[in-house]
Amino acid sequence: MVTATPVKTEYEAIIGLETHCQLNTHSKIFCNCSTKFDSPPNTNVCPICLGYPGVLPVLNLEVLASAVKMGLAINGKIASYSKFDRKQYFYPDLPKNYQISQYDLPIVEQGSLEIEVVDKETKEVTRKTIGITRLHMEEDAGKLVHAGSDRLAGSTYSLVDFNRTGVPLLEIVSEPDLRSGQEAAEYAQELRRLVRYLGISDGNMQEGSLRCDVNISVRPKGQKKFGTKVEIKNMNSFSAIQKAIEYEIERQIEAIENGEPIRLETRLWEEGKQRTVTMRLKEGASDYRYFPEPDLPPIEVSQEQIETWKAQIPELPAQKRTRYETELGLSAYDARVLTDEREVAEYFETAVATGANAKLVANWVTQDIAAYLNNNKLNIGEIALKSEGLGELVNLIEEGTISGKIAKDILPELLTDGGSPKTLVEKKGLIQISDTGELEKIIDEVIASHPKELEKYRSGKKNLKGFFVGQVLKKTGGRADPKLTNQLLDKKLEA
């Protein structure tokens, strides 16, 4: 009797993200209190954000402008009429025992965001469009500081800082179109790029300016019905988002394979132990008892106002990437790296504006300068070499004034001290030797000094040509024109 081998079930993950973006307005969403991040506890508060009786909130119009700009950036439909609602729940960091949010009439619906997923091995870029269900405005809650634990459970006592209460948030809810931890992390990064390009948030996950909750379920591939959804919280980096999802996918598949039920719950990501743990059973929307906010009027936005705010939106990352590829001839990978931060893209473009070759400038920015920034933990705005200086350096190479090797040799000094590359080259006497007669004389001296190597070369060891090139460069301090040196050596070594 032959026993049939069980067919292994293939599963797919169904993932959606709820992203909270803290806006960088100077004052809170419904009062004039400061939004400064590192103020002493409970100093940026007033009767409005603390929910005292008899006070009335007033909408900060900068928050509305930011919401509309972000809505346009994600290709969303801007509502001409929307409203605020009270979301009722009880927690120590919520002084009013309700949060002012938006429920059934959000400011933005039906958006989308294109993401690019990079293969780590091949650097190949794959594009995918993720649907966005809605974007709405709301106020942030306060912050709990736990003694003896990183969360309420297990702490000996907790303190409440209400400075964050009333800080404006945009909540962006994706469709369940994501299928992996890598896709989810890239989606979150693309949102951060957008808010930074728009100038509405710093998108700093470590400071809580960008916070993501993951909703995830798994199901057999080909099945239409969704599995039981689990929410994951407490991820403060993009790598944590990816790792938490990858762990949770494996956990849910293992549970299903073992015949165990998946509970509708909220789980926490424990960075130290690289796992998710149960926090609480999941609440449904009905538990919040939403009803219209009686102290705020409905929000009406005219098409004229939308057009005014639209005109203030800069060229966004996806638009820049397309332009870099189609107009400048850059690879998808280089275009992606250059547009990751707005400051880097601006640095690159200003360098190219000097007339420098775009591909060469891209190579310098994404390789040598990027390595320097990473090694020294700097932003591109903190280096002394201005973008015009990089353009000048690339032009010196293109014109044959200096070699690429000389450029690399002087780059560290330019990055720390700045100044004109041309002036530095002239001062140090590093101008490339491109005169045929002068180079021939130097090559003749090198060949005459190495008769044994010459004999071996002419006996068939052609790889010794590299030795002679090196000797010429050494004798000239790296100033010999590499192309001309190779041409002259070919001629003289075979003579």
Curated annotation (Swiss-Prot):
GO biological process: glutaminyl-tRNAGln biosynthesis via transamidation; translation
Enzyme class: ligase
Protein name according to UniProt: Aspartyl/glutamyl-tRNA(Asn/Gln) amidotransferase subunit B
Keywords: ATP-binding, Ligase, Nucleotide-binding, Protein biosynthesis
Catalytic activity of the protein: L-glutamyl-tRNA(Gln) + L-glutamine + ATP + H2O = L-glutaminyl-tRNA(Gln) + L-glutamate + ADP + phosphate + H(+); L-aspartyl-tRNA(Asn) + L-glutamine + ATP + H2O = L-asparaginyl-tRNA(Asn) + L-glutamate + ADP + phosphate + 2 H(+)
The family this protein is said to belong to: Belongs to the GatB/GatE family. GatB subfamily.
HAMAP family noted in UniProt: GatB (MF_00121)
Domain of life: Bacteria
Pfam families: GatB_N, GatB_Yqey
Complexes and interactors: Heterotrimer of A, B and C subunits.
Protein encoded by which gene: gatB
EC identifiers of the protein: 6.3.5.-
Function: Allows the formation of correctly charged Asn-tRNA(Asn) or Gln-tRNA(Gln) through the transamidation of misacylated Asp-tRNA(Asn) or Glu-tRNA(Gln) in organisms which lack either or both of asparaginyl-tRNA or glutaminyl-tRNA synthetases. The reaction takes place in the presence of glutamine and ATP through an activated phospho-Asp-tRNA(Asn) or phospho-Glu-tRNA(Gln).
Single annotated GO MF: ATP binding
